[in-house]
């Protein structure tokens, strides 16, 4: 009986810890419609591959928060990465041709 009680208390403590834990921030890639870093903005932050919208190639920014990324000239992150991000890039406000980005988590 004492073992079950201890297991229950441990379970409750773990649940409380998880409920109070803050989710960590992740790296993200933002792209603007342009011209430059103006107008509509799209943010890509999910792990894995994201296709960059065809209407947001006016400028970009990569915010590094522990996860690296790679940009591809093709949809669906096919082929060889053209650019790799391992640190932040603050608003590069000129057109770019990448069609997809892969965030490594």
From Swiss-Prot:
Residues 1-26 form the signal peptide. Transmembrane segments: none annotated. Detected at higher levels in needles and twigs from canker-resistant seedlings than in needles from canker-susceptible plants. During summer, detected on cankered, healthy and marginal bark. During winter, detected at lower levels in cankered bark and bark from the canker margin than in healthy bark (at protein level). Pfam families: MiAMP1. GO terms for cellular component: extracellular region. It is found in: Secreted; Secreted, Cell wall. SUPFAM superfamilies: gamma-Crystallin-like. One of its GO terms (biological process) is defense response. It comes from the Eukaryota. Its main location: secreted. Induction: By wounding and by methyl jasmonate. Disulfide bonds join 37-93, 47-105, 49-77. Antimicrobial peptide. This is Antimicrobial peptide 1. It comes from Pinus monticola (Western white pine). The lineage of its organism: Eukaryota, Viridiplantae, Streptophyta, Embryophyta, Tracheophyta.
């Amino acid at each position: 009986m004492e073992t079950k009680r201890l297991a229950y208390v441990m379970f409750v403590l773990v649940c409380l810890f998880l409920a109070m834990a803050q989710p960590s921030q992740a790296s993200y890639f933002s792209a603007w419609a342009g011209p430059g870093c103006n107008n509509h903005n799209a943010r890509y932050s999910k792990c894995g591959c994201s296709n960059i919208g065809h209407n947001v190639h006016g400028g970009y920014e990569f915010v590094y928060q522990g996860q690296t990324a790679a940009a591809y000239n093709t949809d669906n992150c096919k082929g060889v990465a053209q650019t790799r991000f391992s640190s932040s890039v603050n608003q590069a406000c000129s057109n770019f041709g990448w069609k997809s980005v892969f965030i490594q988590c």
